[in-house]
Regions:
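Short beta-strand or tight-loop elements
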Residues: 45, 68, 111-114
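Long, well-ordered alpha-helical scaffolding segments within enzyme catalytic domains
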Residues: 86-94
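Residues in well-ordered beta-strands of folded domains
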Residues: 34-36, 50, 73, 116, ...
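Short capping loops/turns at secondary-structure boundaries
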Residues: 9, 82, 122-126
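Oligomerization/assembly interface segments of phage tail-like spikes and tubes
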Residues: 64-82, 89, 127-137
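Small/polar-rich, solvent-exposed N-terminal microdomains that initiate assembly or binding
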Residues: 1-62, 84, 96-107
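Acidic-leaning, charged glycine-interspersed low-complexity segments
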Residues: 94-140
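Short, cysteine-centered beta-strand-loop-beta hairpins and adjacent loop/turn segments enriched
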Residues: 56-59, 77-79, 139-140
């Protein structure tokens, strides 16, 4: 029997970073993926993501499940590119499951990722697409 992982939905950003950074479609529209904020001097286009909220749900007979809400922001210097980025992110994340494993062998499994909201805007001289995903994490 595998050892219980210490990783919970608080580590979901690590999983999202790996998922987006390893996706060919996403890397085809940008090679810059940042947690929370972009690095100083980052050039458009780029993606930022953050964990917006977290909920733990106990289940009587099974291992519990955490739910994390992840916001992914796609920034580009033109509207069409921002939409292409959003489409690539949605294709990479929506309706998938994903397993992340760190260097120490700890793992985190997103049993389902679902897009729940999206909007667009203008922020810091860039077109922005905001996508919100609900990520259900196995606690095993």
């Amino acid at each position: 029997m595998a050892a219980k992982s210490d990783m919970t939905s608080l580590s979901s950003g690590l999983l999202i970073n790996e998922l987006l950074s390893n996706d060919e479609g996403v890397m085809g529209v940008t090679n810059q993926v940042f947690p929370i904020v972009s690095e100083p001097g980052a050039k458009l286009p780029y993606i930022c993501y953050r964990r917006g909220s977290n909920e733990d749900r106990a289940v009587k007979t099974l291992a519990g499940a955490d739910t994390a809400v992840i916001e992914v922001l796609c920034y580009a210097d033109n509207y069409a590119h921002s939409v292409r980025m959003a489409e690539a992110v949605r294709k990479a994340m929506d309706g998938v499951s994903y397993r992340y494993e760190d260097e120490g062998g700890q793992s985190l499994v997103a049993r389902s990722i679902q897009m729940t909201d999206a909007e667009e805007g203008w922020n810091d001289d860039a077109y922005m697409q905001s996508l919100v995903f609900t990520v259900k994490i196995n606690n095993s």
